[in-house]
């Protein structure tokens, strides 16, 4: 049964991965309203990880979801989404100051941006 439900989540057009402190993940789930509509949610209270299939996600919904994740000291990433959505939005959640360090390392190691262009946070 678990594999069937996990497979159903994989069919959703959007998949969110969230990582939270153990004492914040339940509060985060409690604050979610019906936007965006979740198809399946898997929680691992042992490590604070959430995987959620989303049937629809507007740019505004994503921005609000990122705010809620930040308010609960979490990190969110959209691991699956349509190409158009991924081009318009940063799928790694709210930009963070430490991304600049990753960008400098990437620029030093790959000055021609050959390896995995656009795959680091901040579309680098």
Protein language model features and the residues they cover:
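Conserved glycine-rich FAD pyrophosphate-binding loop
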Residues: 1-124
